[in-house]
Design a protein with these regions (language model features):
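Disordered, acidic Ser/Thr/Pro-rich linker "stalks" and the adjacent N-terminal cap
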Residues: 118-178, 191-198, 275, 800
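Catalytic cores of extracellular degradative/oxidative enzymes
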Residues: 451-454, 461-666, 690, 694
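Pan-zinc metallopeptidase signature
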Residues: 276-336, 645-769
């Protein structure tokens, strides 16, 4: 034994010597080269620590190693080798190797390196899922029975009936244990396929004890029809002797206008592991485990059984543990389904509130500690917005420690949506040893310097830009390439959503609850900009304008257009208007935010759309359809003129806000998808309803304007507008509407209202007319078949009309038609009127706001 000990000491001493010292032991004799590493199978911890391989050699050697993304190899001056490994987020171990070769190439020695798999889940000390569970449902769609919620596969799910035999609420799902169990909590996982149908609303949860037929109420709660997995607590200490648990589902989500469905991807029941709970109480001061008790030493930590708590304890003892994003407080939000139903919008608001600034890797095992959760369930949403992948998964969270295996990589969000959002407490969450990516937040006063620092240190693919009203998620690589001023870019999205909410009356009528609107990135195959329940979706290849910091390049109209799709409200939307009434928002936001003075409707194509509206719409008595020149922007103009006259002039700035509120709070005529029946009037009734409500809200008789602009014209046509439905308005419906308004004895708006735009609106505000004493021909320049008329020569003009010798109206010309504006100089100084000899024009009149006319040119 003594000889073996002495030999070991000698070898150890040799290995600690540098190569030069070892050569002296050879007595100057020439020996065969040797390289002796202390191990040829090195093991590195998953935590990303470094390791040293001692090397004894009698020759110079080099290290041959193929570089990779997790292992760095360095030879030290004393001849030893240092191994530096990144953190291993995966359950599986990973291997590498390196070759030690003498300089003359005559001798080689291979060393294998293994990094341990991530053991942070602490498999022996995780919570226990109860087995031996069966289920019974009072109704189910064929092939979607309750067993699908117990098979451990979120891709399969229980679903209540649809089709010819619809769901009848309540839907009752009963889960029975083979033997009575202690239950601490349950986890309800909604379907994870991107379809919200069947997500739970109001649910009564009951349990039955062994040997009893009595059902005891646990809670009656609203899950908010959200997609996040939810933890259902059975009390602080759990409940013993439970034999059955029953869910009586009273409401659920449906996207087809039906009464709803019920579905469930997985239902699990759990018992809390007491070993982990005891270690949290023994070693840490607080429930979030952010501070060790004063008496805790490294020797004590060695004996901890929960691997993640042990690693955390070491990090806290080292004194360099960052909690910037790992430990945060999160608020509750109104469920997006409830908000949609209240606001009657077309799509839901942000479904990934509460960014954490933590990024996750696929297969990573993580620990999340929660404190402060009361009656409502929360979950961790991990979502990747590309460009490498686009996936989302949810993980239910409970108070205490939650050990999770992450399915897809992405950024983390705390899903905390509850009907009780106004009174629900904030919850505190600790992502133990989480990988910090950070997020930019206008509400925290972040500057562009903060933005640049976040980009420089980003660890994930995507970065969240958070404002008070909007939340953007863009690829880091795109922001690095395009965004010189992240604060400015984030502020533009926040301002767009602010002005849209202002126009919708959410501020005036106290319906802004803090829920943001989302702007996200989708795959290249996503086509063009579009909107859905995820918000404003921007394909990866189309990110240049939305992420720019150049005010002349930023796409105000396009972003407001897609966010406006989300905000399109029943009553301000019927067939033919899907790409129209959202642009009320675009025009409003463009006017408020675009600093170079450009206005799309007035300036694009030198005012051609207005000209088309007047000559092919008003003059030809067209119906209100996108078929006017095949241009939805032409159909937009009368809605825009109502906005300009009320809000733009400041005469009635609350008209549109009050209109939206009326549509939210009254019985708007219902529409039926795909209905092309001769007897279907739903969309036509909506159009009539809009006219009535506008007149009542403004206390003004707009019936003449609505007749001129085609709102009150008989129509009976099938219209294709993402759906095909019939727009059917009879003369009787029109007469009833006109009689309804006339009976109110409201005053009428100015007769020249069809000419109003943003450049001539002050004449309507100030009620000023064109002077009658200006000499005919003043400021008029003939050039070929056109007459250019200078506005300065005809003050207060709002438009022009051209007549032939017999007094027939040939043309209506909008203010500024033909004016070629330029950056910061878009307000027109002249109008170009057609003077085609083939039409025998005789004179042009300057039109005032009240419809009166003064001849300004004649031949």
């Amino acid at each position: 034994m003594k000889l073996k000990y002495l030999y070991s000491v000698a070898v150890a001493t040799l290995l600690c010597l540098p190569a030069q010292a070892q050569l002296k032991l050879d007595g100057g004799e020439t020996k065969a080269p040797y390289i002796i590493p202390s191990t040829d199978s090195a093991v590195v911890a998953y935590t990303g620590d470094y390791s040293t391989i001692h090397v004894a050699s009698n020759c110079e050697y080099n290290i041959q190693h193929v570089a990779n993304d997790w292992l760095t190899v360095r030879r030290e001056k004393n001849g030893n080798i240092s191994l530096f490994a990144t953190y291993n987020y995966l359950v599986a171990a990973r291997q590498d190797s390196l070759m030690l070769a003498s300089s003359d190439g005559k001798y080689e020695r291979k060393v294998y390196v293994t990094q341990s798999g991530n053991t942070m889940s602490g498999p022996l000390y995780a919570d226990v899922k109860i087995s031996g569970v069966s289920g019974v449902a009072n109704q189910a769609q064929g092939g979607y029975d309750i067993s699908k919620s117990l098979d451990g596969n979120v891709a399969t799910f229980y679903h209540s009936p649809w089709g010819s035999t619809p769901t009848t609420f309540p839907v009752i799902l009963t889960y029975n244990f083979n033997t009575a169990q202690h239950v601490d909590y349950a986890i309800y996982t909604p379907r994870q396929d991107g379809n919200n149908n069947g997500n739970w609303g109001q649910v009564l949860i009951e349990y039955r004890l062994e040997g009893s037929n009595e059902w005891i109420t646990l809670k009656d709660t609203n899950f908010g029809m959200g997609s996040g997995a939810a933890s259902i607590s059975f009390g602080e200490t759990g409940i013993d002797n439970v034999k059955s648990v029953r869910y009586t589902i009273k409401s659920g989500y449906a996207d087809d206008g039906s009464n709803g469905f019920a579905s469930c991807a997985e239902m699990g029941f759990y018992q809390i592991n007491t070993v982990t709970a005891n270690e949290m109480n023994t070693f840490f001061v607080d429930k979030l485990c952010t501070q060790l008790k004063p008496n805790v030493t490294r020797d004590m930590v060695v004996g901890m059984k929960n691997e993640v708590l042990k690693r955390l304890a070491y990090a806290l003892l080292d004194g360099n543990y960052s909690t910037d994003y790992r430990v945060s407080e999160y608020r509750a939000y109104k469920p997006v389904g409830e908000l949609l139903n209240e606001l009657k919008t077309s799509y839901t608001y942000n479904n990934h509130e509460n960014p954490t600034g933590i990024t996750f890797e696929k297969g990573e095992r993580v620990a999340v500690i929660v404190d402060g959760l009361e009656n409502d369930g929360i979950s961790l949403q991990v979502r990747n917005f590309g460009p490498s992948e686009y996936n989302t998964n949810w993980y239910a969270l409970k108070n205490g420690i939650n050990v999770l295996t992450i399915i897809n990589k992405g950024n983390g969000y705390i899903d905390y949506y509850t009907s009780n959002f106004q009174h629900a407490p904030n919850v505190n969450v600790h992502f133990v040893l989480g990988k910090q990516n950070g997020y930019f937040d206008l509400t925290k006063g972040h500057t562009n310097n903060d933005f640049m620092e976040l980009l420089a240190n980003a660890t994930g693919e995507d970065l969240d830009l958070v404002g008070q009203y909007a939340q953007c998620v863009f690829p880091v690589e795109t922001l690095r390439a395009n965004t010189a001023d992240g604060r400015w870019t984030a502020l533009q999205f926040d301002s767009i959503t602010y002005y849209e909410r202002q126009l919708m009356g959410l501020f005036k009528h106290n319906r802004d609850y803090g829920n943001r609107q989302a702007i996200i990135t989708v795959p290249k195959s996503g086509g063009l900009y579009h909107a859905n329940n995820d918000g404003c979706c921007i394909p990866f290849q189309a990110l240049a304008q939305p992420t720019t910091s150049d005010p002349n390049y930023f796409d105000y109209w396009g972003m407001a257009h897609e966010l406006g799709h989300v905000n399109q409200t029943a009553g301000v939307l019927w067939i033919g208007l899907t790409e129209v009434t959202n642009n009320i928002m675009s025009a409003y936001c463009e006017h408020k935010l675009k600093k170079n003075g450009f206005h799309r409707l007035e300036n694009e194509s030198q005012g051609f759309r207005y000209y088309n509206y007047l000559n092919n719409g008003i003059m030809k008595e067209a119906k209100l359809l996108p078929s006017v020149g095949g241009d939805v922007f032409v159909t937009l103009i009368p809605f825009y003129q109502l906005l300009t006259y009320t809000e733009g002039t400041g005469l009635q700035p609350d008209a549109y806000p009050d209109l939206y509120e009326t549509m939210r709070t009254t019985n708007v005529p219902a529409i039926q998808r795909g209905n092309t029946s001769e007897n279907y009037y739903g969309d036509g009734q909506r159009q009539i309803y809009f006219c009535k409500q506008w007149c009542d809200i403004t206390q003004t008789d707009y019936t003449d304007f609505f007749i001129q602009t085609g709102f009150l014209k008989p129509v009976n046509e099938d219209i294709g507008d993402y759906d095909t439905r019939r727009l059917h308005i009879t003369q009787d419906m029109i007469d009833e509407c006109i009689n309804y308004v006339k009976a109110k004895n409201y005053p009428t708006p100015p007769a020249g209202l069809v000419f109003i735009d943003t450049y001539n609106k002050n004449a309507f505000r100030d009620k000023v007319t064109v002077p009658a004493n200006i000499a005919i021909g003043t400021g008029c320049i003939k050039s070929g078949s056109n007459i250019q008329i200078q506005h300065a020569s005809w003050p207060n003009v709002v438009g022009f009309k051209t007549y032939d010798a017999t007094g027939n109206l040939i043309h209506m010309t909008n203010y500024g038609h033909g004016y070629a504006g330029s950056n910061n100089h878009y307000e027109p100084t002249y109008t170009v009127c057609a003077w085609n000899s083939a039409e025998s024009p005789a004179r042009i009149t300057a039109v005032s706001y009240d419809g009166s006319e003064v001849t300004c040119y004649q031949e």
